A protein has these predicted regions:
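Short, contiguous alpha-helical
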Residues: 28-76, 105, 116-156
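Acidic/histidine-rich alpha-helical segments that form the ligand environment
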Residues: 9, 13, 78-117, 137
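Short acidic/polar alpha-helix capping motifs at helix-coil junctions
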Residues: 4-7, 19-23, 68-70, 80-86, ...
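Alpha-helical structural elements of signaling/regulatory helical domains
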Residues: 2, 48, 52, 88-89, ...
């Protein structure tokens, strides 16, 4: 897939998740099933994950090859009461997701094919290229968008 096709897929995934998240009604936010997160938790997770992705892409672009790309424990973040996954309004998280994705897309649109092989060392995943970043963060909102649909249907 060319960088232009990858950028288009990244943007499409952004719009897919935003359309779903913006369509969740307030009385649907806390629909939860035993195996998964509620719609509220999914939306907050996507905002936090994208904040991580924003920093990761910039490190991969700007820092020397082999720089450390920090992981994080999403499950710990999800249960930290101060982060509000269980209760905070989702509007700010939707705005963060949209803004961060737009900023990252600007960078993706300036990449050249050769940039896709720039790499760092992810603390959990090991060797980590811009291509791997792009693939992962293109799929991530699609996967969680599908999870959001299932949560609203009461399935997982």
């Amino acid at each position: 897939m060319s960088i232009q096709e990858s950028a288009a897929a990244y943007e499409s995934a952004t719009q897919y998740f935003l359309n779903l998240a913006r369509g969740v009604m307030k009385d649907q936010l806390d629909i939860k099933n035993p195996e998964g997160w509620s719609a509220r938790q999914i939306i907050h997770h996507l905002a936090d994950s994208e904040a991580q992705s924003y920093a990761r892409l910039r490190r991969l672009v700007a820092e020397p090859e082999g720089s450390t790309i920090q992981g994080y424990d999403e499950n710990l973040w999800a249960v930290a009461p101060q982060l509000g996954y269980e209760s905070a309004p989702v509007e700010n998280s939707i705005a963060v997701f949209a803004a961060v994705r737009a900023g990252s897309l600007d960078i993706v649109n300036r990449l050249e094919e050769s940039d896709l092989e720039k790499s760092g060392v992810h603390t959990e995943a090991g060797h980590y290229t811009i291509a791997k970043w792009l693939e992962g963060y293109t799929n991530h909102p699609k996967d969680h968008g599908d999870q959001l649909v299932r949560a609203l249907k009461g399935l997982n």
